[in-house]
Amino acid sequence: MAKQIEAGKFLVIECTAGELMDAVGSDICICDWCGQPYHLSDKGCYIAVLNHWYCKKCYEEWVSRAEWYPEDADVERRNFNFYAPRLGVKCQ
């Protein structure tokens, strides 16, 4: 089940490839960083500030070096508020 996870100030939703595919109406889920396709049950993270879904490996690499900028907060919140209900996550 999709859930919001702690990632500093970033708004991130952990979800399976299948949950993301259902939310966006896609037939395939590909990591937006490495380009690899993933099975329905594989977990990854939707990163609202990037409006991307990363596999767990790419997410861990990204979050270790990511820097939050306050000027991105409005777009990040808008993206999160759009996808969170589609993934079954309550907007905060």
What are these regions (language model features)?
Residues K56-E76:
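Short metal-binding segments enriched for Cys and/or His
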Residues P37-H39, V63:
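Short functional micro-motifs and their immediate structural scaffolds
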Residues M1-I5, P85-Q92:
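Short intrinsically disordered terminal tails
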Residues S26-C31, H52:
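Residues immediately within or flanking Cys/His clusters that coordinate Zn2+
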Residues M1-S26:
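A broadly conserved sequence feature marking short terminus-proximal activation segments
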Residues C31-C34, I47, C55-C58:
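Short cysteine-rich clusters marking metal-coordination/redox-active sites
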Residues D42-H52:
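Short linker/helix segments within small regulatory modules
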